[in-house]
């Protein structure tokens, strides 16, 4: 799907976002579901989705990005970093024009003012702690200093690998 979408200036998320909107609309129609409490939690590739879907599906009350948050542009273009996608065979990772428009801090800004959280294992191979902290600092500054809602934004660091903490 990704390869077919790219020539049309689309990504896999052009397909995923409408699916999520439909799912959230359906869940909201069920009497046993509190539509104000539907949240998004994503691990690994799901973490990518946690950054890209909630900005466009406003029905999600919060978003948690686990084992994925980083400096996306650096991750895609660096030829020096061992963390770079340049050295992997993951062809579906590169997304049309994303580096020219959004990094993770900007995607998190589109989630605001809804609560946003990052789960980060110190031994996760996504990126070094310093890179994650640098990108998250921009998000924290937005939530705390600019919007005055610092209680809605956090990062949880834990000793562990590319996994859910808890």
Description of each model-found segment:
Residues 41, 66-67, 119, 158:
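Alpha/beta-hydrolase-fold catalytic nucleophile elbow
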Residues 49-90:
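Hydrolase active-site cap/lid region
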Residues 137-166:
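C-terminal catalytic histidine-bearing segment of alpha/beta-hydrolase fold enzymes
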